[in-house]
């Protein structure tokens, strides 16, 4: 079942990549999470960038180094963290609890320190209603910054200061 399921996903990813490659020169990738269900090499074979999503609790950041090291080497292409949480994580409730001060800062630097070229957050602004109300963001529904917004801004300034070194 697992091999069948993996082939199904790879087939779908390849089908979508073929269509997108016809209409854009932008890099094409697919968001992945670290599970044992996929062949990451097969999934990324026709893609231009390796993308990874992670929503682990702050206590698991050390384990994320392994995931970054593994996925970054799947293909000799850019490695992007395309979804991670700015604060808490949740859909209808805040899963994994509160993030201690500094966790978002470390979560921003870690993938870059492990060879990542980009880190993106889910969500930029908190939802005013609907699904994922309990998901952290950079700004609340009124547009006010959370504590984690400053941590991300600090890392962004440091990325800018280290730009030449990080490009190597």
Please report, for each region that a protein language model flagged, where it lies by residue.
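Switch I (G2) and immediately adjacent beta-strands of P-loop GTPase domains
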Residues: 18
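Distinct, well-ordered alpha-helical segments
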Residues: 33-44
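Carbohydrate-binding surfaces of carbohydrate-active enzymes
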Residues: 6-7, 11-14, 22-26, 34, ...
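Surface-exposed cleft-lining segments at the edges of enzyme active sites
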Residues: 1-5
């Amino acid at each position: 079942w697992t091999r069948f399921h993996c082939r199904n996903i790879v087939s779908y990813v390849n089908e979508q990549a073929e269509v997108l490659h016809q209409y854009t020169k932008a890099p094409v990738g697919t968001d992945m999470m670290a599970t044992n269900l996929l062949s990451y090499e097969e999934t990324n074979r026709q893609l231009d960038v390796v993308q990874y999503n992670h929503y682990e609790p702050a206590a698991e950041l050390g384990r994320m180094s392994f995931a970054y090291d593994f996925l970054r080497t799947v293909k000799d292409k850019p490695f992007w963290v395309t979804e991670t949480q700015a604060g808490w994580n949740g859909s209808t409730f805040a899963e994994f609890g509160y993030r201690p001060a500094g966790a978002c800062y470390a979560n921003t630097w870690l993938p870059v320190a492990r060879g990542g070229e980009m880190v993106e957050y889910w969500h930029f602004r908190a939802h005013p209603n609907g699904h994922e109300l309990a998901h952290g963001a950079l700004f609340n529904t009124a547009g006010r910054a959370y504590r984690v917004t400053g941590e991300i801004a600090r890392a962004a300034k440091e990325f800018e200061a280290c730009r030449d070194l990080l490009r190597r």
